[in-house]
Amino acid sequence: MKPAVIKTFVKCIREFKRPTILTLIFIVAEVFIDVLIPFYTADLVNMIKAGADLNEIVRIGLILVAMAIVSLACGGLAGYTGAKASAGFARNVRRDVFTRIQRFSFENIDKFSTASLVTRLTTDISNVQMAFMMIIRIAVRAPLMFVFSIVMAYIMGGYLATTFVIVIPVLVAGLLLIAREAMPSFRAVFRKYDRLNESIEENVRGMRVVKGFAREDYERQKFGRASDDIRKDFTHAERVVALNNPLMQLCIYFNMVFVLTVGSRMIITSGGQTIDVGQISSMLTYGMQILMSLMMISMIYVMLTMSLESMKRIAEVLNEEPVLRNPENPVTQVADGSVDFEDVSFKYSAEAQKYALADIDLHIPSGATVGILGGTGTSKSTLVQLIPRLYDVSEGSVKVGGVDVRDYDLETLRDAVAVVLQNNTLFSGTIKENLRWGNENASDEELAEACRLAQADDFIRSFPDGYDSRIEQGGTNVSGGQKQRLCIARALLKKPKILILDDSTSAVDTRTDALIRAGFRSYIPETTKIIIAQRVASVEDADLILVMDNGRISAMGTHEQLLQSSEIYREVYEQQTKGGDSDEA
C-alpha cells in the first residue's frame, strides 16, 4: 500500500486518537495476561499432582481467577474503545468523502459514476471500518500472542517446542495459498458492485419507462445476472477461505498428538525430571495460542486485502482535487446582473477534439431578458453553465457584474445566480422545506407570493396538507409541470441577480408560461433573466434573442429583427405558428 493512501486515512482518526490508543493498551495487557495464565496453570497442576498444601493451591487458583477477570475486563474495554474508535473513524471518512464530493465540479463528477460514488460511501467505507477495527484489535493481538507464546513455549517445554518448527511452516504456507487464491475474487466483487448499483439506480429512476414498456422481466433478468456474478465470486472466495478451519484443526491435532506422545515418553523415561505434567498442559495451551494467532493473522490478511481495494477507491475520491477553486483573494460581492462573454470557447476536456462552444461574444445588461433558441445539441445549456462557473472556459472569459467569474468566491457567485433546469430536482420533505432551499428564512407569506408568481399556489392549496404536503424523493408524487413550477418558485425566493431558466417551462401550457413570465417582470425587474426554450412564444417578448447553431451564436436580435434576418428562427416560428402549440400542463 502506498504511504500516501495510509496518510490519507490516518488523518481521519482525528478526535478518536484517544480510544484508538486505549484499545491498543488494553489489547497488550490482555495478551500479556493470557500468556501468563498457562504458566501458572502448570504450577497448579503440578501442585495438585504432588499433593501440595491446600492453602497454596487456593492461592494459585485465586491468582488465576483474578488474572482471568482482569483479562476479561481488558478484552471488554478493548471492545468498547475499539468500537468507538472504528465507528468514529468511519464517520470521519464518510464525512470527508461526502464533503469532497460536494466540492467537485461537473468535470470531477464525470470521472466517477453516481453508482460508484454511492458504493464508495457505503460498502467501501464499511469494509474500511471493519479493517480499522481488526488492525487496532486483532492485528495487534495476533502477532503479540504469537511471539509471547513461542517464547513461553520454549521456556516451558524445551525440546517439545520443536513441534512448532513443523507445524508453523505448514500452516503459514497453507494460509498464504488460501489467501492468494481468494483475493482475485474479492477484488472482482467490488468492481461488480458498481455495475450492480448502476443497474439498480437506472431501474429505479426509469421505473415509469420500465412499466410503460412492460420490461419488468427483462430488468429482473438483468439484475439477476449482475447479482449472480457477485454471488459466484463470493462463493468461490468463501469456499477457499473455508479451508482455513480444516487446516487449522489438522495442525492443532498434530500438535496435540506430538506433545502428548513425546511428552508422555519423556516423563516415563526421565521419571518426571526432564518435563512434568504441568509443562505438558501449558505446552498444549501455548500450542493452541500460537496456531490461533496464525489463523487470526491469515484472517487479517484476507480482510486487509479486501479492504485495500476499498481504501484505494476511497482515496481516489479524497485525493481528487476539485478543478474549480477559489482564487487567493476572491471577490465577495456581485455588483449587478450584467453578463459578458468575451471571445469564449469551451470544450469539456483538454483532450477533446471539438469545441462545444466557439467564438462567443455577448453583452447582457443587468435586468435584461434574454431568450436562447436552438436545436438539440447546439450547446445552449453549456453556454449558461459557464455563468455560475459550473465549468471554466477553455479560452476567453465570462464576466458577471464586470468581474471575471474566476475571480469570485464560488459561493458568492452561485448565490447570485439561480438556475432552474428542465429536469430539476425536488428533495424528500415538505413543500415548504423544498421552497426554503431558495431562502431558508423566508416567511410563509413570501413562500405563498413566490408560488403565486410561479403559478404554483393553486395546486399546492388543493393538496390536503397544503404547503406542508410531503414531496417524495425526486418529486415522484407531483407532475412534471408542478415540479417545474415549484422549482421556479424556489428560485424566485432566492431573489438572484441572474435567473437562468433552462427549458424549465416545457411541461406547462403556453398560458401558464406567459403568466410566469409576466410575474418575472413585476417581481424581479432588476434581475437578469436568461430563458432557454424550444417555443418561440416563451422568448418572443425578450429584449434579446440568441439563435444557437453548432456551438455558435448564428444570429441575435429582437423577435421582429430575427424574423427578418435569421432563416433558422423564421423557420422555427413558422412551424410552431402553423402547427400550433399544444403543450399541456
Task: Pin down the residues of each PLM region.
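Membrane-integrated ABC transporters
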Residues: 1-34, 41, 47-64, 78-82, ...
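Juxtamembrane helix-loop junctions of ABC transporter transmembrane domains
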Residues: 2, 25-26, 33-46, 67-114, ...
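Transmembrane helices of ABC transporter permease
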Residues: 15, 19-32, 43, 133-189, ...
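An intracellular "coupling" helix at the cytosolic face of ABC transporter transmembrane type-1 domains
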Residues: 15-17, 103-107, 123-132, 136, ...
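Alpha-helical transmembrane segments of multi-pass membrane proteins
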Residues: 19-20, 67-86, 137-144, 165-191, ...
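Short intracellular "coupling" helices and adjacent cytoplasmic loop segments at the cytosolic face
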Residues: 50-51, 87, 95-119, 123-125, ...
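Helix-loop-helix
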Residues: 52-56, 148, 152-166, 236-313, ...
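ABC-type nucleotide-binding domain
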Residues: 333-585
